[in-house]
Amino acid sequence: MTNIQTWIDEYHKGSRFGLNGDVLIKQKSQYQEIIVIENEYYGRALMLDGCWMTSLKDEKYYHECLVHPALSSIDEKSNVLIIGGGDGGTVRECVKYAQISKIDLVEIDEEVIKISKKFLKEIGGEAWHDKRLEIHVDDGVKWVKKTRDNYYDVIFIDCSDPSEFSNLLFSDSFYKECKRILTPKGILATQSESPESFKNIHINILKTLKNIFKVSETMYSFVPIYPSGIWSWTFASSEDLNLSKQNYDEILKIEKGCEIWNLNFQNAAFKMMPNKIIKELDS
């Protein structure tokens, strides 16, 4: 079904967020239903199994916040792993760093990559052709299990909300395996859901990472297309995590290519934890 104008809604606990426009593609992959719609305000937007994943209008709120706090603060960043990220946005932000030698993108659903390359070209752009990128159509959990110890400097978990095929990406055992394959000073960076719409999942992620890693920090910002509009990203490490330790010359170069992220934005975002979340984490 293509080029049919209609409303497409995401439903969440008695509420809904919808976009009206032309449906460019609607198909069922092995894992999920994939829809791309063209909306007057948000531009092209991607929905997976009834949940909005990204749009051309606001995708940089998500991708820049996931990537740059980790990569701008770690000295050694040769090997990077992205789990999920089939729209190409996380890859695009990673390739801005010349020190990276290799990026492994592990996406379970090849159709997401194909459709993103065709209908959401503005997101991945030329990053799809970067020589450092290797794309693996594979299960992220299985990939991590078969990876040797201390291999990756940074791991990005850029996955959808918990579902039948992604639940294990939020599990205790998976985070422990990620810790195993990280270098001693490596950083795990993960989207950690909304403190409002997915509060229980959010709390569970934060508590789990706090128990597994020596230190973890969470930042909050806006992704308008997501339920409640507020989202979070959590960064964890087995060593001291100093996300304010920056190479300022490098930061200035990166900031120039960003629409949302800069160092002041980041520093403020790490101080935005709602008090109700603090209370639950301390209980």
Curated annotation (Swiss-Prot):
Where found?
A: Cytoplasm
- Positions bound to spermidine: H63, D87, D158, C159, S160, D161
Tell me what reaction this enzyme catalyses: S-adenosyl 3-(methylsulfanyl)propylamine + putrescine = S-methyl-5'-thioadenosine + spermidine + H(+)
The lineage is: Bacteria, Bacillati, Cyanobacteriota, Cyanophyceae, Synechococcales
Annotated keywords: Cytoplasm, Polyamine biosynthesis, Spermidine biosynthesis, Transferase
Q: What is its EC number?
A: 2.5.1.16
**What positions constitute the catalytic site?**
D158 (proton acceptor)
Family, per the entry?
Answer: Belongs to the spermidine/spermine synthase family.
Its pathway is: Amine and polyamine biosynthesis; spermidine biosynthesis; spermidine from putrescine: step 1/1
Q: Which InterPro entries match?
A: PABS, PABS_CS, SAM-dependent_MTases_sf, Spermi_synthase, Spermidine_synt_N, Spermidine_synt_N_sf
* Biological function: Catalyzes the irreversible transfer of a propylamine group from the amino donor S-adenosylmethioninamine (decarboxy-AdoMet) to putrescine (1,4-diaminobutane) to yield spermidine.
Q: Which residues bind S-methyl-5'-thioadenosine?
A: Q32, E107, D139, G140
Output the GO biological process annotations, alphabetical, semicolon-separated: spermidine biosynthetic process
Top-level taxon: Bacteria
* Organism name: Prochlorococcus marinus (strain MIT 9301)
A single GO molecular-function term is: spermidine synthase activity
- A Pfam family found in this protein is Spermine_synth
Q: What class of enzyme is it?
A: transferase
Q: What is one GO cellular-component annotation here?
A: cytoplasm
Q: What's the subunit arrangement here?
A: Homodimer or homotetramer.
Domain (PABS): residue spans on this chain: 5-238
Q: What is the protein name for this chain?
A: Polyamine aminopropyltransferase
PROSITE patterns tied to this protein = PABS_1, PABS_2
Q: Where is the signal peptide?
A: none
